[in-house]
UniProtKB/Swiss-Prot annotation:
Organism expressing this protein natively: Cereibacter sphaeroides (strain ATCC 17029 / ATH 2.4.9)
UniProt-annotated binding residues for substrate: G92, H93, D252, G257, T258
Function comment: Catalyzes the epimerization of trans-4-hydroxy-L-proline (t4LHyp) to cis-4-hydroxy-D-proline (c4DHyp). Is likely involved in a degradation pathway that converts t4LHyp to alpha-ketoglutarate. Displays no proline racemase activity.
Coiled coil regions in record: none
Alphabetical UniProt keywords: Isomerase
Name listed for the protein in its UniProt record: 4-hydroxyproline 2-epimerase
Length: 337
C-alpha cells in the first residue's frame, strides 16, 4: 500500500440527510469562477468525488460539497455539490449544514450580533445564508435561495401501477418534476424507499420525454435531475409531506431545501399560498421539518419568479482525514445499486 493523498472533511446531517464537506486539499485555479472550478474538478479531481461519495467511504445515498475559495469579493465561499454519480447546481440541506459547520468550526468569523451572514457562490447563482449562534452553540441557518419559478404545468405521463399522472416542472435551484400522489396508493415513508426510488426514476424519464429544460438566464442549466412526490402531511402544521428522488435514485431524507423552494413556487402558482406566507415542509422520515417563505417576486429574464427563503438546522457528526490510494480500484470507490 502507498498512501498518495490525504483529504480533510467534516460530516453533518440535516434532518437525516448526510453531507460530506471537503474543505482542504484541492488547489483551485486562482481567480477562477465557480463554473471554472467545477470544470477543474470534473477534469482533475472527479476521482476524489468518487472516492469520498462511494463505498467504502460513502454509500449509494451519500451527498457532499466541495467548499471552495470565493472567486471575487462579492462572495465569502463557493459551493460545488456532488453525489456518487454527478454534480448538482445547488442544495438547500447542504447550504444549511455547511453554513452551520463553517461557523461552528471557525471557518468564518462570527458576527458579534449572533447572526453571521455568509454569501455563497453556487453554479445556480448567489445564495445568502444567515447563521444564528449564541455563546458556543450554533442554532439554525436561514438562506435566501436563487429565484424559483414554474416552467411548465400539467405534464401528462403514465406511472406503471399508479395510472396516469401529471407533473409540474419547477426551478428551485435545481429543476424538479413535482407529482401529487394524493390520488394514488403510493405513500411517502422509509419502508417504501425502494418503490419511491424506482418510480421516481421512471417518472423522471417520462417527464424528460415531454419537456425541454432550459433556465431563462443560465445557459449551462438545462437538465431535470429531481422528481418530487408529495401528499398530505403526517406532522401537524405542515403544508405537505414530500420526498425528492435524484441522481441514480437517491432519496433525500430531509424535507429538501431547493425542494422546499420549488414546492413553494409550485403552490404559489396554483393559488394555494401567497407571498410572505410562512409554510412548513415535512420530509421522508416524518420527523424533521423546514420552514419556508416567499419573501417577494422578481424576474429571470422575462420570466416571473419568486424569492424563497428556507430555515432549518443541521447536526455535526464528526471529522475525518481520508487517505486515498488511487492505485487500488476498490479504494477509489464503487457503488452497489
Amino acid at each position: 500500500m502507498r498512501v498518495q493523498d490525504v483529504y480533510n472533511v467534516i460530516y453533518t446531517h440535516t434532518e437525516g440527510e448526510p453531507l460530506c464537506i471537503i474543505y482542504s486539499g484541492v488547489p483551485y485555479p486562482a481567480g477562477s469562477t465557480i463554473l471554472e472550478k467545477r470544470a477543474f474538478l470534473e477534469e482533475n479531481y472527479d476521482w476524489l468525488r468518487k472516492a469520498l461519495m462511494r463505498e467504502p467511504r460513502g454509500h449509494a445515498d451519500m451527498f457532499g460539497v466541495f467548499l471552495t475559495p470565493p472567486s471575487s469579493r462579492d462572495y465569502d465561499a463557493g459551493l460545488i455539490y456532488i453525489d456518487g454519480k454527478e454534480y448538482s447546481h445547488m442544495c438547500g440541506h447542504g447550504t444549511i449544514a455547511v453554513a452551520m459547520a463553517m461557523v461552528a468550526n471557525g471557518l468564518v468569523a462570527r458576527d458579534p450580533s449572533g447572526l453571521t451572514r455568509i454569501r455563497f457562490e453556487t453554479t445556480a447563482g448567489l445564495v445568502v445564508a444567515e447563521v444564528a449562534h449564541e455563546d458556543d452553540r450554533v442554532l439554525w441557518t436561514r438562506f435566501e435561495n436563487v429565484p424559483a419559478y414554474v416552467a411548465a404545468q400539467d405534464i401528462a405521463f403514465e406511472l406503471p401501477g399508479y395510472g396516469p399522472l401529471k407533473a409540474d416542472l419547477v426551478w428551485g435551484g435545481n429543476y424538479f418534476g413535482i407529482i401529487d400522489l394524493r390520488g394514488t396508493s403510493l405513500r411517502i415513508a422509509p419502508e417504501n424507499g425502494s418503490e419511491l426510488s424506482r418510480m421516481g426514476l421512471i417518472a423522471r424519464e417520462e417527464i424528460r420525454k415531454k419537456v425541454t429544460v432550459q433556465h431563462p438566464t443560465e445557459a449551462h442549466i438545462n437538465n431535470l435531475n429531481f422528481v418530487t412526490f408529495w401528499h398530505e402531511p403526517t406532522i401537524e402544521g405542515c403544508l405537505y409531506k414530500n420526498v425528492h428522488v435524484f441522481s441514480a435514485g437517491q432519496l433525500d431524507r430531509s424535507p429538501g431545501g431547493t425542494g422546499t423552494s420549488a414546492m413553494m413556487a409550485y403552490f404559489e402558482a396554483r393559488g394555494v399560498i401567497g407571498l410572505n406566507q410562512p409554510i412548513t415542509s415535512e420530509g421522508l422520515l416524518g420527523s424533521g421539518t423546514f420552514e419556508g417563505c416567499l419573501i417577494g417576486e422578481t424576474t429571470l429574464g422575462t420570466v416571473r419568479a419568486v424569492r424563497p427563503t428556507v430555515k432549518g438546522t443541521a447536526g455535526m457528526l464528526g471529522t475525518a482525514s481520508w487517505t486515498i490510494n488511487r492505485e487500488d480500484p476498490v479504494d477509489a470507490g464503487f457503488l452497489v445499486l
